[in-house]
A protein has these predicted regions:
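Feature detects amphipathic, helix-rich regulatory segments
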Residues: 1-253
């Protein structure tokens, strides 16, 4: 009762609605128990998929200066390289595209159109010509990238001029998205290029471009990107088709 911030007497005086028939009470209790068991079962499967992805990510990128990853798809034997981020990805800044939809960056969720956002975001529509264009699957360095890594555009649109946009000609965005959001990249590679304190922190973009990142042949990047996309789809489907519906049923009951 301490968590509720009310006295024990007041807590036990709360009126509750329940059937008078004990048989009905027991049936409802059994149903809720079954729902809890199902939720636990599917949550375990969901957690297992998430852990599989985490483990595979750890093994599909070379560690500690190694030139090959621990796990590879059949048919790939070339050594991986370490290249500067600025060599793999080119920064671009293209403005005067007010005809494109303004986008909002979602931490860990790509981008959405501002007019589709649940939050009523205010912005000066007269300044849209100063916004930067970003193409689908290109990377965005946004205001909180020092915490969650780089974000990837889900569609073409325009973003705040405070952001930086990058395109990789021979880079599979799904492959690098996983890397750019990894703890290793954020805490070890990116952190030395973050300056300022608290809410004033920013990324030194020129310094970030010097970070050495793994580079594999485009076909191998694509194979890894395909695999990670498949895993993400399984994880999302399991949550949407199994866990959420059961939680909704329990809430209604």
């Amino acid at each position: 009762h301490g968590l509720l911030n009310i006295s024990a007497d007041d807590f036990f005086d709360i009126d509750t609605t329940m059937p008078e028939d004990k048989v009905e009470q027991e049936k409802i209790g059994r149903l809720l128990k079954k729902l809890d068991t199902l939720i636990t079962l599917h949550q375990r499967k969901y957690d297992k998929l998430v852990n599989i992805k985490k483990s595979m990510l750890d093994k599909m990128f070379p560690k500690n200066g190694a030139s090959v990853p621990e796990i590879r798809f059949k048919g790939f034997t070339d050594l991986w390289e370490q290249r500067k981020l600025g060599e793999v990805f080119e920064e671009y800044s293209e403005k005067n595209h007010a005809e494109l939809p303004p986008l909002t960056i979602i931490q860990g969720g790509g981008t959405i159109r501002r007019d589709e956002s649940e939050r009523a975001l205010q912005y000066d529509k007269s300044s849209l010509s100063n916004y930067k264009m970003v193409n689908k699957d290109d990377f965005i360095v946004h205001l909180r990238s020092f915490e969650g890594g780089l974000e990837k555009a889900s569609s073409q649109g325009i973003i705040s001029p405070a952001y930086h946009t990058f395109h990789g000609e021979d880079a599979d965005s799904r492959f690098y998205y996983a890397y750019f959001r990894s703890k290793k990249f954020i805490n070890k590679d990116l952190k030395p290029h973050v300056y300022g304190i608290r809410d004033g922190r920013s990324i030194d973009i020129e310094g970030m471009k010097t970070i050495r990142i793994p580079w594999a042949s485009y076909p191998e990047q694509k194979s890894i990107g395909d695999f990670l996309t498949h895993l993400d789809t399984l994880i999302t489907l399991h949550q949407r088709e199994h866990i959420k519906p059961i939680l909704e049923v329990k809430r209604v009951k």
